[in-house]
Curated annotation (Swiss-Prot):
Mg(2+) binds at K201, D203, E204. This is Ribulose bisphosphate carboxylase large chain. The modification N6,N6,N6-trimethyllysine is found at K14. The gene is rbcL. Its main location: plastid. The disulfide bond which can form in the large chain dimeric partners within the hexadecamer appears to be associated with oxidative stress and protein turnover. It comes from Castanea sativa (Sweet chestnut). GO terms for molecular function: magnesium ion binding; monooxygenase activity; ribulose-bisphosphate carboxylase activity.
Amino acid sequence: MSPQTETKASVGFKAGVKDYKLTYYTPDYQTKDTDILAAFRVTPQPGVPPEEAGAAVAAESSTGTWRTVWTDGLTSLDRYKGRCYHIEPVAGEENQFIAYVAYPLDLFEEGSVTNMFTSIVGNVFGFKALRALRLEDLRIPTSYSKTFQGPPHGIQVERDKLNKYGRPLLGCTIKPKLGLSAKNYGRAVYECLRGGLDFTKDDENVNSQPFMRWRDRFLFCAEAIYKAQAETGEIKGHYLNATAGTCEEMIKRAVFARELGVPIVMHDYLTGGFTANTSLAHYCRDNGLLLHIHRAMHAVIDRQKNHGIHFRVLAKALRMSGGDHIHAGTVVGKLEGEREITLGFVDLLRDDYIEKDRSRGIYFTQDWVSLPGVLPVASGGIHVWHMPALTEIFGDDSVLQFGGGTLGHPWGNAPGAVANRVALEACVQARNEGRDLAREGNEIIREAAKWSPELAAACEVWKEIKFEFPAMDTL
């Protein structure tokens, strides 16, 4: 080796491992309006300082690797690196910290949720220096959100398409979720829609199985929709699940739904993937279809409070990728959902501008700059006695979805739908008259049951049903 080369190597490059915090922990950094900001809940391994753990997250989710490399000198590390700019302890938790990381916008491909997640969470969660890691929230800058189409249509366009205003929409998941023939499935759809529901729904794992192929299901459901519309004078829909093994097959199913003239299709966005979901959302906007999103598999990712990704992040990602509805918990039913946290991500789905509010788990102010909103769907173990609370909690811009709470009615599917519609109309009227749904809800339902035998029967069946378990995910 020549003396010149030896000198250059010794001065400009030093092989080996170095502390991440020397490069990636920058507490004096002033965040930019164009930065993507992330809040991570970090649990370091014993002996790892929180500053080093936060810096490691910033490094491994941006430009860093485990050692200094020659090619570091061929780019501007200062321009492209992620920066851990603030760390704070988590109240009431030992050895847990919130690490705030800023990412330069140039690290991300425009209009790609897939690339965003691959960068931010794709590799760092297996890092040895961390015992556990959870992505609690993201701030999406307006300069990045404007590169996304977002929901195919949004809340106002959906209401205009359906000609339904001033109340939540009502839905029902057809049960049993698996095993029905296409004709019997279509019959259940018709009975529920005829009874007063706005939508019925394929369950998330109804795709194209031997007992009911997708094309047969689509045909019988379309027949049910048109028959119910003719008899009620209302626009009806059924969430036809287009999720498939390939993107090409998924689009083929959406095309067939459009040819049938139905208003809405459905996708399982986490199991199907963000690339497939964005492709379907673009097709739906171009062809006038609404898009219902199911969050199957979400609890695998978001349920543990110290590891994974919080659902508010998955909800933001869905609004960017595209969907007109998404399941969002209930607060009162059988599935997970703590009230303030749930209302926090419901606002992130629906509103244009959401202020930072740590009491609801919102770590950053989020400006969606008129990206269309998403209707939250409440489903899972809910029935007529829950109607006042659901109406108060979720408001008009929501879908309230009763599966067993419709089909479990002792008189059949149509009376179950009637009971839910009567309960909803009674709650909306009482609210509009200034009554307190939280305090007077049960009395409102009892009053309506006096003139609706279907509701009276439903009230009797579900008066003792409760799901009394504490929420796992609390602040």
